[in-house]
Regions:
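Solvent-exposed, polar/charged alpha-helical surfaces in well-ordered, non-transmembrane soluble domains
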Residues: 50, 58, 62, 66, ...
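Loop/turn elements at helix/coil->beta-strand transitions in domains of secreted/extracellular proteins
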Residues: 46-47, 69-71, 96-101, 124-129, ...
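Catalytic His-Asp segment of secreted/periplasmic serine-dependent ester chemistry enzymes
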Residues: 144-201
């Protein structure tokens, strides 16, 4: 089991490295592949986004990088929100002044209110977009409820409803119904693009 997990981590690190070094696609190709408006593709291509997440984000990292060529992705297998503020601070050394933050955490355990507070302090007044949780885990619904509550506390915290978008779409995922693949990873990236560019579909 440990060997398999180590192989998975190595594979995901390789995938993430490839994503961060990807050659940008043309805007037309992005719009067509991800079924987003050309204006969405254009805006996304110009945004500096600092993304921090868990293995779900790793699974969609190549797609995120195609849509957001200036996105810096720091995603890790098994990551939880307890280290979010520290992880964000460290990631800011790679992108000190992002236009927006994208966070994808909550798959691996419970999110606490003070963890979100600490992360929002690091983000300052910059927009923070948090991808909510789509997973058959006991903490998924409480996490999503907390995120919705915290978005009312912070005007610059926006929740991206991945759980609603992905509901009933088992073909978008690997057998665990958590990690997106193929069409699912494309839909994940498209949802992020439409959310961060604030362009109505």
């Amino acid at each position: 089991m440990y060997k398999r997990q180590a192989q998975q981590i190595a594979l995901q690190k390789k995938q993430l490295a490839e994503a961060n070094n990807k050659v940008p696609m043309s805007l037309k190709a992005v719009a067509e592949k991800y079924k987003v408006q050309p204006v969405v593709a254009e805006k996304a291509s110009q945004m500096n986004v600092l993304a921090l997440g868990d293995s779900v984000m790793v699974a969609a990292s190549t797609n995120l990088q195609e849509v957001f060529p200036h996105m810096y992705i720091d995603a890790a297998v098994g990551r939880q929100a307890e280290s979010l503020a520290t992880d964000l601070t460290n990631a800011k050394s790679k992108m000190p002044n992002p236009d927006a933050y994208l966070i994808g955490l909550g798959t691996n355990g419970t999110i606490k209110e003070d963890e979100i507070d600490a992360a929002m302090k690091v983000a300052g007044n910059k927009p923070v977009y948090w991808m909510n949780v789509h997973a058959d885990r006991v903490w998924a619904k409480p996490n999503n409820n907390l995120l919705t509550k915290m978005a009312k506390k912070y005007k610059n915290l926006k929740i991206i409803d991945w759980n609603k978008k992905a509901s009933g779409q088992s073909s978008w995922f690997y057998s665990d119904n958590i990690h997106p693949k193929g069409t699912g990873a494309e839909k994940y990236a498209a949802l992020v693009a439409n959310s961060l560019t604030n362009v109505e579909k």
